[in-house]
A protein has these predicted regions:
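Buried hydrophobic residues that stabilize the cores of well-folded domains
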Residues: 24-142
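Bacterial Sec-dependent N-terminal signal peptides
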Residues: 1-31
Length: 142
């Protein structure tokens, strides 16, 4: 019985290693480079570029993240943009809004709706902690 359990673990480990190998191989040799914009010691914008061919040195925009902070210097909004190669412009993709109250933190994830021109709330998570910042309850809404 112990031998069967051992072989199951070995098989699961081998499967995990091969999945990781396939995931690494899917980038097709692309290198990703990021450009960070800092203000007051805080990251406010990160642009991600792909370098398909290191010899040419040509960078292609992929994603951009913009961050907002509250007066306590805690992150409140993360906006995600994707590069549209046909329009040569950044297009809104999603937004994450973090709201903090005394012992409650709310995280709302919204996806951009092109037809409406606004965000559609996709997921909402609420985390409740005690005075020692230990998690008491977690709620998820879709």
């Amino acid at each position: 019985m112990k031998t069967i359990t051992f072989f199951k673990r070995v098989l699961a480990s081998a499967a995990l290693v091969s999945v990781c190998g396939f995931a690494c191989a899917t980038n097709n040799g692309k290198q990703f480079i990021h450009n960070d914009t800092m203000e007051g010691g805080k990251l406010v914008c990160r642009e991600i570029y792909a370098m398909n061919d290191a010899a040419s040195g040509i960078l292609n925009p992929v994603k951009m993240y913009k961050y907002s902070y509250d007066t306590d210097q805690q992150k409140t909004v993360k906006s995600t943009y994707a590069w549209n190669i046909f329009k040569n412009t950044w297009e809104t993709e999603s937004r994450t809004v973090i709201s903090r109250y005394e012992t409650e933190t709310s995280v709302e994830y919204s996806v951009w709706n092109k037809e409406k021109g606004s965000f559609d709330l996709s997921k909402k998570y609420i985390y409740i902690t005690d005075n020692n910042n230990q998690l008491i309850a977690q709620y998820a809404y879709k």
